[in-house]
Regions:
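Anionic-ligand binding patches
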Residues: 2-9, 15-159
Length: 159
């Protein structure tokens, strides 16, 4: 008899994010979206760090769905901007998810800053289970900001 997989709710309805979680964890877990778990919420990300925001989302979904949950938060930190846009990366221009405007504002704010304009992409993931301590991981990818967008087919700060 095949062992039943533990249900893991992803604190997102983003199809690309769900696909990635299913590709990585689908053999070990039954990965479901918030929508599939019957959770209809716009969770306020009011933490001051990526880790706090991931934990806020994961805890909300765990409590609403009475199941293990996983959430992530990520963004760009630019040294010359004191770490901005940071946790506000997706809404840096004032509107959530306007990638072109976020990139334009970032480049505007870096005008006159000489190379190398050091930056890093930060991603935090929180895994929570009822009656267990949370597991929180953080990863970074170092780089620098160029003078203009380059490439195609990307998203966010990778156009």
């Amino acid at each position: 008899m095949e062992k039943q997989k533990m249900r893991l709710i992803v604190a997102s309805n983003n199809a690309n994010k769900l696909r990635e979680f299913r590709e990585i964890l689908g053999e070990q877990f039954d990965i479901v979206s918030m929508r599939e778990a019957g959770i209809d919420a716009d969770i306020e990300e009011n933490g001051t760090t990526f880790e706090e925001n991931a934990l806020i989302k994961a805890n909300y979904v765990m409590n609403a769905g009475n199941s293990a949950a996983i959430a992530d938060d990520s963004g760009l930190e630019v040294d010359a901007l004191g770490g901005a846009p940071g946790v506000y990366s997706a809404r840096y221009c004032g509107r959530h998810g306007d990638d072109a405007a976020n990139n334009a504002l970032l480049l505007h704010n870096l005008k006159g800053v000489p190379a190398p304009r050091k930056a890093r992409y930060v991603a935090a993931i929180a895994l929570v289970r009822p009656a267990h301590a949370p597991i929180i991981c953080r990863g970074t990818c170092e780089g620098e900001i160029l003078n203009e967008p380059r490439g195609q087919g990307g998203f966010g700060y990778d156009p």
